[in-house]
Design a protein with these regions (language model features):
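Alpha-helical substrate-recognition element adjacent to the catalytic core
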Residues: 1-3, 8-132, 141
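C-terminal cap/substrate-recognition subdomain and adjoining C-terminal extension
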Residues: 1, 75, 82-218
Length: 218
């Protein structure tokens, strides 16, 4: 069996699921637009530049989850999927995932699993490696549990996940990772088939230098 790994935001989706979740909450009147959008833009700029402090960002990202009961969040998420995610789900991304049926497939994303688990199911991908929000008594605490699934943390989390299955990356004759971002270089550099998907300029330059495949799902 081969291994196929997919980044989510700006790879399988034409947008960012965490950003869209925040926009949804703003539209629900849950978050203050002016305050939240200014901070979110700062974090996004840092992400693009490869300078994001993931712990600082996650404290910001996960705080809204701790303010509302899980049953309310789940209800909002159903609306969020219909309103925000389905419109940015790339048809060509569905086709790409279908081409890997029969491989061991997983989405590997820095965005938290509350936001992304239903999206993985929408793609028909059974396995999700994501940043895990901590919870107590069934409710989110606003904290993170385990290693954030970001930069080198994506590779760390993948190694741990494979170990639970009794295998390692070397167990697969072929492995793919599809991503748009320079932040994913630590994992891209470790698979046999790194694929840059509609990449940012830095990743495109790296991919061209190392003769990696570059594709578009737009």
């Amino acid at each position: 069996m081969n291994l196929a790994l997919f980044d989510l935001d700006h790879t399988l989706l034409s947008g960012d699921s965490d950003f869209e979740w925040a926009q949804f909450l703003i539209e629900q009147g849950v978050l203050d637009r002016e305050v939240y959008e200014a901070r979110n833009q700062t974090f996004f700029d840092q992400y693009k530049n490869g300078t994001l402090d993931i712990r600082e960002f996650l404290a910001f990202q996960l705080k809204p989850l701790s303010r509302h009961p899980r049953r309310v969040l789940d209800g909002w998420h159903h609306q969020f999927m219909q309103k925000k995610i389905l419109p940015i789900l790339r048809p060509r991304a569905r086709e790409l995932v279908e081409r890997h049926r029969g491989d061991l497939c997983a989405i590997v994303t820095a965005t938290n699993s509350f936001v992304t688990a239903p999206i993985a199911r929408e793609f028909g991908i059974d396995h999700l490696i994501a940043t895990e929000p901590a919870h107590a008594g069934g409710e989110f605490t606003g904290e993170v549990t385990g290693t954030p699934c970001f930069r080198e943390g994506k590779f760390t989390r993948l190694v741990d996940w494979l170990a639970l299955r009794g295998v390692s990356l070397a167990s697969f004759a072929q492995s793919w990772f599809y991503s748009d971002s320079l932040n994913d270089l630590p994992l891209l550099s470790r698979v046999t088939h790194p694929v840059a998907v509609d990449p940012d300029d830095t990743l495109r330059a790296h991919a061209e230098k190392h003769h990696w495949q570059i594709i578009s799902l737009q």
